[in-house]
Amino acid sequence: MFIPEKIGTPLSPNATKVMILGSGELGKEVTIAFQRLGVEVHAVDRYDNAPAHQVAHFSYVIDMTDAAAVRELVTTIKPDFIIPEIEALATDELVRIEQEGLATVVPTARATQLTMNREGIRRLASEELGLPTSGYEFCSTFEEFTAAAERLGYPNVVKPVMSSSGKGQSVVTSAEDLESAWEYAMSGARVSNQRVIVEQFVEFDYEITLLTVRGIDPATGKPATWFCEPIGHRQQDGDYVESWQPMEMTAPALENARSVAARITNALGGRGVFGVELFVSGDDVYFSEVSPRPHDTGLVTLATQRFSEFELHAKAVLGLPVDVTLTSPGASAVIYGGVDSPGVSYAGLAEALAVAETDVRLFGKPEAFTKRRMGVAVSTAEDTATARDRATLAAAAVTVHG
């Protein structure tokens, strides 16, 4: 993977350039992290005035699943790195772009291709690497889905093979739920007539995100892996509501989690931050999913770590030293839109920021939806329980008005 010997000057002929595909709140923080290291950032999304558009040097609106549009933009910008920040991309074209040497895809084009589809990454994890996972089957029709659900037993979890932020995901408790679960999965899929994955329900104690950083060890000049402290999180309808760091784990469970994370990220290759999602039951750890990029539950690291997951991503991509030190226990809580309206206003910021050791990040999205993530409150404290209380209180104080 390419390592720049020097960082150029933005907006000049020698600029070091990154092209970010996906300009939401995570892309915005990644943009800022690269800019602080002197990198010229080109932010791309499917709609105008996305959060990263508002801070990048240049912004573009294209259909990122359109191979020709992606190639044309790459040819125009000539980026050193392409940084995917979402899954819905023309990943086959990214593979060709990488093979032709037009740009380095982060962490690799293959990783981006595999992780956009739950089938690809699950087969890699379970069937090739032998990582512990829940029982699962993939289905193309309602009839296959019904049969798989009966074989796997109830309750089970159904998800489209391609979706994000919990869209189309549901728990099936009996045969009576099958039809509605199938219809919901189809409605939440990125493309029509998509396959689904049916998973046995894992009786777990908790779930974590283990942010795993692949970078260059400055002592040896060789690739190395670092682990941030585990992040606990609470999900609602498949989307994260709050997260906290560190999540208390037994020593054997943490060792197992790091082993699983190292194996899956080594298989994907490249450099950068990976969000490895795991279920934990006692000392046992089960692989769930992996994102080859900063993770939404990792927004808590804006408050808890010496360098946030976004800063770690930028440094690792550029081949610079990384530091995963935790500086304080902390938590994050999501601020939802609550309304369906463009150009919303926010109230309650003074009350939110009056909460001890708390900050608020509003993402600047041009349009609100009832369940759209519009901001986040992040808090620190002597312990995660207090931090969670503070973040939840602050998030509740912020109200969104159409």
Swiss-Prot record:
ATP binds at residues 118, 159, 164-169, 199-202, 207. Pfam families: ATP-grasp, PurT_C, RS_preATP-grasp-like. Pathway: Purine metabolism; IMP biosynthesis via de novo pathway; N(2)-formyl-N(1)-(5-phospho-D-ribosyl)glycinamide from N(1)-(5-phospho-D-ribosyl)glycinamide (formate route): step 1/1. SUPFAM superfamilies: Glutathione synthetase ATP-binding domain-like (SSF56059), PreATP-grasp domain (SSF52440), Rudiment single hybrid motif (SSF51246). It is an enzyme of class 6 (ligase). Keywords: ATP-binding, Ligase, Magnesium, Metal-binding, Nucleotide-binding, Purine biosynthesis. N(1)-(5-phospho-beta-D-ribosyl)glycinamide binds at residues 25-26, 85, 296, 365, 372-373. PROSITE patterns: ATP_GRASP. One of its GO terms (molecular function) is ATP binding. It catalyses: N(1)-(5-phospho-beta-D-ribosyl)glycinamide + formate + ATP = N(2)-formyl-N(1)-(5-phospho-beta-D-ribosyl)glycinamide + ADP + phosphate + H(+). Residues 123-318 form the ATP-grasp domain. InterPro entries: ATP-grasp (IPR011761), ATP-grasp_carboxylate-amine (IPR003135), ATP_grasp_subdomain_1 (IPR013815), PreATP-grasp_dom_sf (IPR016185), PurT (IPR005862), PurT/PurK_preATP-grasp (IPR054350), PurT_C (IPR048740), Rudment_hybrid_motif (IPR011054). One of its GO terms (biological process) is 'de novo' IMP biosynthetic process. Mg(2+) binds at residues 277, 289. Belongs to the PurK/PurT family. Involved in the de novo purine biosynthesis. Catalyzes the transfer of formate to 5-phospho-ribosyl-glycinamide (GAR), producing 5-phospho-ribosyl-N-formylglycinamide (FGAR). Formate is provided by PurU via hydrolysis of 10-formyl-tetrahydrofolate. This is Formate-dependent phosphoribosylglycinamide formyltransferase. It comes from Corynebacterium efficiens (strain DSM 44549 / YS-314 / AJ 12310 / JCM 11189 / NBRC 100395). The lineage of its organism: Bacteria, Bacillati, Actinomycetota, Actinomycetes, Mycobacteriales.
